[in-house]
Each structure stands twice: as C-alpha cells, then as structure tokens.
Design a protein with these regions (language model features):
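Short, small/polar-rich loop/turn modules that mediate ligand/substrate recognition or access, typified
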Residues: 24, 110, 115, 186-188
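Substrate-binding pocket helix/loop in short-chain dehydrogenase/reductase
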Residues: 34-35, 42-47, 156
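Active-site helix of classical SDR
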Residues: 58, 94, 102
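Alpha-helical segment proximal to the catalytic Tyr-Lys
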Residues: 63, 107-108, 184
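Residue(s) in the substrate-gating loop at a strand-loop-helix junction
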Residues: 78
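Short C-terminal tail/terminal secondary-structure segment
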Residues: 83, 174-176, 187-201
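A conserved structural motif in NAD(P)-dependent oxidoreductases
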Residues: 145, 159-171
C-alpha cells in the first residue's frame, strides 16, 4: 500500500466530488503461523498491512471527511481481534491492534463529527475458499463433494452455530449500516458478523 498513490487518489476524488461521506478500510488476509515460526519479515508485513492499510487511507481522506455532513469511517476487522488463534498469531495480534486503533480514532475524531466503527468477520464465503476447494479436488485424495457440500462440512467442523459460512452480502449490509446516517449516534463500536462464533461478552 503506497501512501503517495493514496494521496493522489484522494486528490482526484476531491477534484471530482468535493468530499466523501464514508471511507471503508478493507485491507486483509490471514497468515497461518505460530509465534515460533513467524519470521521478522512476516511480522513486519502483517503489521504493515493491517495498520497502514487503515492509517494511510484515513490520513489521505480525512480532509474530505471533515467537510462532509455525515462523515463515517468503517474498518473491516476479524473476530481474531478478540479471539486469537494460536496458528494465526501474527494476524490475531495485528487484528487486536486494529481494534484498539478504531477505538482511539473514534475518540479523537468525535469532536469533528466523524464516526469510526468496525465489523468483526467470522468465516465468510469468498474466492479463497473456492481456491482451497479446487486444490482439494485436484489432489489425489478422493473428493466427490460439491462446493456447497464441502463448505457445509467445513462449517460443521468449525462448529459455527448457524451451521454455514457467511455470504458476502451479509457483512456488506453491516458496513452499509455503519457508513450511513442510520447509525448517526454510533461510534467506537463493532458489529459481530460471525454466525454466532463470538465467545466474548
């Protein structure tokens, strides 16, 4: 993520539209590693993506949000922020830091009328799962399940209470709510979109 490119993009948006009402920060990906086998380079890459994937866009578009009638920033985060997994230690740590950053920005930007919230994703159906299915299907192991049946089996293995993966439009609806005037009195909050996987109170 290049800061200069974001600054250029923000300038182009300002010239065309004048301001923006909402900024959605969605830089993600999961790194499978334990503490012991996470390299220094992997730590830096993970923290850079999760932190500066929010910091740089927010810095670039903050002036445009400050002149909006209903400014909102929404960050896409993960349930790992509150429920770390030992096989995803770097990602879990970075996600927890991002959650704290959201709270901090919400407090600081409140006086400007800019709301800052986030959503915490559970397991959402996406292209990465299709790739994993295709890889399993092309392996030497017997594999006759359909993609849908394979996803359902994974949902059972993961003990997702709603017994299925989330659909992309479901977190999108949560993002729309937090970005819109419908949530005009909400800041520093998170919406859990995990199918009931959350164990926190």
């Amino acid at each position: 993520l290049e800061k200069e490119q974001l600054d250029i993009f923000a300038k182009a948006v300002e010239e065309r539209f004048g301001n923006i009402n909402a900024l959605i920060n969605n830089a993600g990906g999961g790194r499978v590693s334990t503490f012991s086998n996470t390299t220094d380079e992997a730590w830096v890459a993970e923290l850079n993506l999760k932190f500066f994937g929010v910091i740089y866009p927010t810095q670039a578009f903050l002036p445009l949000l400050e002149v909006s009638d209903n400014p909102s920033i929404v960050c896409v985060n993960s349930l790992l922020a509150l429920q770390p997994e030992p096989h995803m230690v770097a990602t879990s740590a970075a996600r927890a830091g991002l959650l704290n950053l959201v709270y901090s920005m919400a407090k600081e930007f409140a006086r400007k009328g800019i709301r800052v919230n986030s959503i915490l994703l559970g397991t959402i159906e996406s292209g990465q799962w299709q790739k994993r299915y295709d890889k399993a299907k092309s392996s030497n192991e017997p594999h006759t399940e359909s993609y849908e049946a394979w996803l359902n089996q994974l949902a059972k293995q993961k003990n997702i209470p709603l017994a299925r993966f989330g659909h992309p439009e479901e977190p999108a609806k949560a993002l729309l709510y937090l970005a819109s005037p419908a949530s005009s009195y909400t800041t520093g909050s998170t919406i859990d979109v995990s199918g009931g996987m959350a164990k926190h109170i």
